[in-house]
């Protein structure tokens, strides 16, 4: 989402968060095969796959469990592997297909189209073997709901990824998910509470505990150093990530999701009733805008002056979607993060119906169900929903939930100039390059089109 229109990690006065310009690169779409963010993303994906293949290898050889239980576990692992390849298809397009942990040969590249077919085939095969219940026992596991959600995402983006739209497939998978026992939680914030494992809207979460060595650390990334004094906990914040101003301004300020997503305004010292002061003596007021200090503008790799410059500590709307637990003491957060939830299913089905020009009444009903839950009434309902309405609603409902870049590509807005990104981006940057370090380890890899060949 740092490459989309939703998040930004601005450089602060004094150079904090410059970090070699990696965040400017992400915002301006100027990343390279040796960029840290590209390497980091590739590493997360490949290490995730290696872990899955390793555990699969152990369980496959095990004689200590019943055939039925082994089939379930192996199916869940195949689902997790397919999930990681779904992420790779989205972000990198082309990558090696590796499923055998004991095969030490250097794999060749597999095309995006073939990886797409692999993911669809794997998920289709394992669904009958996965559990379908929506319960405490199934929470956090790769269930039928999770598998169908990945399939729906594959079909939703099929036109972009393989050149063949499959809107009908989106509707079919969404309908199957809605037959399961998931619900649209009456209270939107239930999905983001400290103990949001009670939500029956969440389909596939990242599960966190405060004791995790590297758990949910959103508070560290986004909050100012003094924000915990106001929010009622302790910890060393990093004062990094903000919401992009133009994205914040797309929200209706009367929409509860506005305050439910962003921390904006003065931070009041609870002991004095006064606005806190930063170390530079400024009032700690989180503004929507990021005001670049004149004379601090940075140059790009070609030596051209950019609009990117240093901003003050207090500038920027902070992420406020996941509830900050009062009383936390230098720990990570307990809140799980939903990779998939039912609200997204409603919006995906609505989008597919509108794109097919079919059953606009049902599409409108689905979007209005999400809006009514947010506002608490039907006063803000649509009479006939459009694709633009759905695009905007996805932003309001799913902000910071890992969908914005994908949505922008699908709706044709990703490459356009926007905040801190003055130029149109070339088409090839819809996917990221294969990292140079990955090629150094495996010379069979081939660079994605548009990027410098290895």
Predicted regions and their residues:
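Conserved, well-structured interaction surfaces
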Residues: 17-92, 106-114, 123-137, 317, ...
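C-terminal substrate/ligand-recognition segments
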Residues: 264, 268-368
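An aromatic- and glycine-enriched ligand-binding surface/loop that stacks and positions planar moieties
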Residues: 1-21, 123-127, 141-297
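Long, intrinsically disordered, low-complexity segments
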Residues: 17, 45-48, 112, 118, ...
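Acidic, glycine-rich segments characteristic of secretory precursors and extracytoplasmic regions
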Residues: 1-15, 39, 54, 97, ...
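Short coil/turn linking the two alpha-helices of tandem helical-hairpin repeats
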Residues: 87-96, 134, 157-164, 355-358
């Amino acid at each position: 989402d740092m490459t989309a229109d939703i998040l930004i990690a601005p450089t602060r006065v004094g150079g904090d968060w410059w970090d070699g310009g990696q965040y400017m690169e992400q915002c301006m779409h100027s990343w390279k095969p040796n960029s840290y963010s590209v390497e980091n993303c590739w590493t997360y994906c490949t290490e995730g796959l290696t872990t899955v293949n390793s555990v699969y290898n152990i369980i496959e050889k095990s004689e200590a469990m019943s055939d039925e239980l082994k089939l379930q576990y192996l199916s869940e692992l195949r689902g997790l592997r397919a999930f990681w390849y779904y992420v790779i298809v989205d972000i990198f397009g082309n990558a090696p297909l590796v499923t055998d942990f004991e095969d030490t040969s250097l794999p060749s590249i597999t095309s995006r189209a073939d990886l797409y077919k692999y993911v669809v085939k794997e998920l289709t095969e394992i669904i009958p073997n996965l559990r379908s219940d929506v319960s405490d026992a199934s929470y956090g596991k790769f269930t039928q709901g999770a598998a169908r959600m990945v399939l729906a995402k594959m079909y939703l983006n099929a036109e972009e990824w393989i050149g063949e739209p499959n809107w009908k497939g989106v509707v079919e998978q969404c309908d199957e998910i809605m037959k399961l026992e998931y619900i649209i939680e009456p209270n939107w914030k239930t999905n983001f509470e400290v103990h949001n494992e009670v939500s029956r809207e969440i389909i596939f979460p990242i599960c966190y505990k405060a004791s995790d060595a590297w758990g949910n650390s959103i508070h560290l990334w986004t909050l100012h150093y003094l924000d915990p004094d106001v929010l009622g906990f302790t910890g060393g914040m990093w004062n990094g990530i903000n919401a992009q101003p133009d994205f914040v301004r797309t929200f209706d300020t009367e929409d509860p999701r506005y305050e439910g997503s962003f921390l904006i305004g003065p931070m009041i010292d609870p002991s004095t009733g006064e606005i806190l002061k930063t170390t530079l003596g400024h009032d700690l007021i989180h503004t929507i805008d990021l005001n670049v200090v004149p004379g601090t503008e940075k140059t790009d790799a070609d030596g051209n002056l950019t609009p990117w410059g240093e901003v003050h500590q207090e500038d920027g709307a902070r992420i406020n979607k996941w509830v900050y637990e009062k009383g936390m003491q230098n720990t990570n957060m307990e809140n799980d993060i939903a990779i998939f939830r039912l609200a997204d299913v409603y919006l995906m089905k609505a989008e597919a119906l509108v794109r097919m020009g079919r059953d606009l009444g049902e599409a409108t009903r689905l979007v209005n169900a999400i809006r009514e839950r947010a506002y608490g009434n039907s006063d803000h309902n649509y009479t006939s929903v459009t694709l633009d309405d759905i695009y905007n609603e996805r932003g309001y409902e799913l902000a910071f939930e890992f969908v914005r870049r994908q949505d922008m590509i699908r709706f044709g807005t990703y490459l356009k100039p926007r905040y801190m990104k003055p130029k149109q981006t070339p088409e090839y940057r819809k996917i990221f390059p294969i990292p140079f370090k990955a090629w150094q380890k495996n010379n069979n890899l081939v660079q994605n089109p548009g990027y410098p060949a290895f």
